[in-house]
Swiss-Prot record:
It comes from Methylococcus capsulatus (strain ATCC 33009 / NCIMB 11132 / Bath). Its cofactor is thiamine diphosphate. GO terms for molecular function: aldehyde-lyase activity. Keywords: Lyase, Thiamine pyrophosphate. This is Probable phosphoketolase. CDD domains: TPP_PK. PANTHER family: PHOSPHOKETOLASE-RELATED.
Length: 811
């Protein structure tokens, strides 16, 4: 039995088929302007179809034949005409108002709607001369789209003017906000897909308007592309009442201007008037703030464009709805090469744009089409902000050596590892007051980076309460960006970096997983950029992971997850770096190196609590430069073959490995132990797999070819096996790490549960060395008793034994 659908009482208010509706009234365009704007849009739509369908006859100079059709039809029509419509009107605004503007396309698979205008404005051909403004160039342009050896269906790094791919939905507003920071003359037009608006990251990022200072920052103009449908379903925002949608957007702090309809001429007039009003609102807010010197939060404008999905496609194909329905999403006319009726339909559709009026005899867009685009670097495809390396200035970095701590002897004093880093970052911010920002999800103070507030407060432009004076550290000109959304912060940082600036993000280790997929997308972006000669170098994304697993004993199981490193290792070796500095001075050395680097994602793992300190500054620099090495002071094998290699990576695993080494040397003075600490995790991979990898000769020299290696690791143990599985001595490598054995513990109990503690490691060594396997039975028994005693003490007192918590290296 067919389901009966009650027709919505809001249908007449929401349908795009009927008279055009707009919040802003007026007809700013004369008839000639309407004609030219519409011609440019027609050309964009023709190009979008050509990209999806054609491998021959690009200008339909002859009847369309099956051999002109691509063998495999890929791409997405649905949002392309709507994106091209927006781009066309932004071009007009740039020319009229002399705007510095870049464009971001949030809707999924919208590249045809962006690539078309890029081609017409000439920016595409300037970067890719084989796609010039000729019939042959146009054919090359069509063929490459969604084609092996060509380009994808998103605004990939190969797309001029793009810093937002849109492959994974949800980040367009946060990227736009980051781009606008410290760019007072820039307007970032960010088209939000109405399907994209259902994602968690996008839903949260409507709040970016609380992070833009109208004095020093540029503006973001959100444009909600309300075309009504996702792949196979209606979108939520398109199916709530007009009042509810307007109230929602007003509640987020915007002034929403609606443009709704499908009839081209009246929609052009409405969109032109609305874009003009939006620019006026932006300039008025900025002018007032800059004249008064008082930064208040404006009610920024945004545009809601309600128009048909797949606009200008046939309303129906084979008796089924297409334009204005989800069937327009991908390839509306299928099986074209084999179905003569479909071929005829496609040809009629393409000819409806009248390509003979849009391109001259040589295949070049006619002059009036080209004149609709801005000139030079005002073209959004060539705006330098969208290739941020053109604008990047080197950071002024103070000498990190001046922020270290004195370490007279290894393993004797404690210090909070991240606190001196905060002092270092404070002075980085002082020296770079216009191109460096610090990001954190309400955790910078918790992560002991709060020294930065002496140089720059936390940005805050919402309401203030009297109690904020008591340590709130809030200011409308702050440069520390805090919001409890890792997604939004990561997006802001990416947008900031890709437009030529520098930044640093810290977050809790367990919850960095929130941005796993964002990390993936940025790594992919950088990897492709490294292959494009025209893409300029950008600053690396520096990510400090702290509040780490081994000091989350008090917060419990949910806060214990070091698995982000596994995610990082999956990505291309040309962009990923992982560092696990064990103490203050090594952390400072690593941070300095990362801040100076380009085109990488640097992941630094360092806990914030008090930890033993092992290296003076000179030793730390030498050790970090090598990436790993033997700690002579903890080893006793000099000039001899070791009986065992004790290796470690991470602050707590290093402490426990040292304590185990001390226990073993006390019990078995003749035992030759080589102690190796690893800072640069990718040193473990062969040099053929990662540029930082050790040669096999160097690896074998350090880790031996046949001796047991006990490796105490910060993360999940199998990651070390993944990295080192090709090594000669891998069969003798025994890795200890986090194994999901956690709860509310003391630090040592958590270590015992996961067998990274000193006693478990010492027992492991005894079991691996035949010469002491039997004679060591008494020592093993004592170590097990000590484990039991430590547990009992923790259960009774809630803390570790003083001799454990206060352990020092006995050297």
């Amino acid at each position: 039995m067919a389901t009966q659908f009650p027709l919505s009482s809001e249908f007449e208010r929401l349908t795009v088929y009927g008279p055009t509706r707009a919040t802003v009234s007026g007809t700013p365009l004369d008839a000639e302007e309407v004609r030219k704007i519409h011609a440019f849009w027609r050309a964009c739509n023709y190009l979008a179809l050509g990209m999806i369908y054609l491998r021959g006859n690009p200008l339909l100079r002859e009847p369309l034949k099956p051999e002109h059709i691509k063998h495999r039809l890929l791409g997405h029509w649905g949002s392309s005409p709507n994106l091209a419509f927006v781009y066309t009107h932004l071009n007009r605004a740039i020319r009229k108002h002399d705007l510095d503007m870049i464009f971001m396309a949030g809707p999924g698979h919208g590249a045809p709607g962006v690539l078309g205008p890029l081609y017409l404005e000439g920016s595409y051909s300037e970067i890719y001369p084989d796609k010039d403004l000729s019939e042959e160039g146009l054919l090359n342009f069509f063929k490459q789209f969604s084609f092996p050896g060509g380009i994808g269906s998103h605004c990939t790094p190969e797309t001029p003017g793009s810093i937002h791919e849109g492959g994974e939905l949800g980040y367009v507003l946060s990227h736009a906000c980051g781009a606008a920071f410290d760019n007072p003359d820039l307007i970032v037009a960010a088209v939000v897909g109405d399907g994209e608006a259902e994602t968690g990251p996008l839903a949260t990022s409507w709040h970016i308007n609380k992070f833009l200072n109208p004095i020093r920052d540029g503006a973001v103009l959100p444009i909600l592309n309300l075309n009504g449908y996702k792949i196979n379903n209606p979108t939520l925002l398109a199916r709530i009442s007009h009042e509810e949608l307007e109230n929602l957007l007003r509640g987020y702090g915007y002034t929403p201007y609606f443009v709704e309809g499908s009839e081209p001429e009246s929609m052009h007039q409405a969109m032109a008037a609305t874009v003009d009003r939006s620019i006026e609102d932006i300039r008025a807010a900025q002018t007032e703030a800059r004249a008064s010197g008082i930064a208040r939060r404006p009610r920024w404008p945004m545009i809601v464009l309600r128009s048909p999905k797949g606009w200008t496609a046939p309303r129906q194909i084979d008796g089924h709805n297409v334009e204005g329905f989800w069937r327009a999403h991908q390839v509306p006319v299928a099986d074209v090469a084999k179905n003569p009726e479909h071929l005829k339909l496609l040809e009629g559709w393409m000819r409806s744009y009248k390509p003979e009026e849009l391109f001259d005899a040589e295949g070049c867009p006619v002059a009036e089409i080209r004149e609709m685009a801005p000139a030079g670097l005002r073209r959004m495809g060539l705006n330098p902000h969208a290739n941020g390396g053109h604008l990047k200035k080197a950071l002024r970095i103070p000498n990190f050596r001046n922020y270290g701590i004195e370490v007279a002897k290894p393993g004797q004093i404690e210090a909070p590892n991240t606190q001196p880093l905060g002092v270092f970052l404070r002075d980085v911010m002082k020296e770079n007051a216009h191109n460096f920002r610090l990001f954190g999800p309400d955790e910078n103070t918790s992560n002991k980076l709060d020294a930065v507030y002496a140089a720059a407060k936390k940005f805050w432009i919402a309401e203030y309460f009297p109690e904020d004076q008591d340590g709130g550290e809030l200011a409308p000109d702050g440069r520390v960006m805090e919001m409890l959304s890792e997604h939004t912060l990561e997006g802001m940082l990416e947008g900031y970096l890709l437009t030529g600036r520098h930044g640093f993000l810290s977050t809790y280790e367990a919850f960095v997983h929130v941005i796993d997929s964002m990390f993936n997308q940025h790594a992919k972006w950088l990897s492709i950029c490294n292959q494009l000669s025209w893409r300029q170098d950008v600053a690396s994304l520096n990510l400090l992971i702290t509040s780490t697993v081994w000091r989350q004993d008090h917060n419990g199981f949910t806060h214990q997850d070091p698995g982000f490193l596994d995610v990082v290792v999956n990505k291309s070796a040309d962009v990923t770096r992982i560092y696990l500095p064990p103490d203050v001075n090594s952390l400072l050395s690593v941070a300095d190196h990362c801040l100076r680097s380009q085109n990488y994602i640097n992941v630094i793992v360092s806990d914030k609590q008090l930890h033993l300190q092992f290296m003076d500054m000179d030793a730390a620099i030498a050790h970090c430069t090598e990436g790993l090495g033997i700690w002579e002071w903890a080893s006793n094998d000099e000039g001899q073959e070791p009986d065992v290699v004790m290796a470690c990576a991470g602050d707590i695993p290093t402490l426990e490995a040292l304590a185990a080494t001390a226990l073993l040397r006390e019990e078995f003075p003749e035992l030759k132990i080589r102690f190796i600490n690893v800072v640069d995790l990718f040193k473990l991979q062969p040099e053929s797999e990662h540029p930082h990898g050790l040669s096999d000769k160097d690896f074998d020299s350090l880790f031996t070819r046949d001796k047991p290696v006990i490796f105490n690791f910060h993360g999940y143990p199998w990651l070390i096996h993944r990295l080192a599985y090709r090594r000669t001595n891998h069969a003798n490598m025994h890795v200890r790490g986090y194994k999901e054995k956690g709860n509310i513990n003391t630090p040592l109990e958590l270590a015992i549960n996961n067998q990274i503690d000193r006693f478990s490691l010492a027992i492991d060594v005894i079991d691996r060395i035949p010469e002491i396997a039997v004679s060591g039975a008494h020592a093993k028994a004592r170590f097990r008793k000590q484990q039991i005693a430590c547990r009992q003490y923790a259960y009774e007192h809630g803390v570790d034994m003083p001799e454990v918590a206060g352990w020092r290296w006995p050297g």
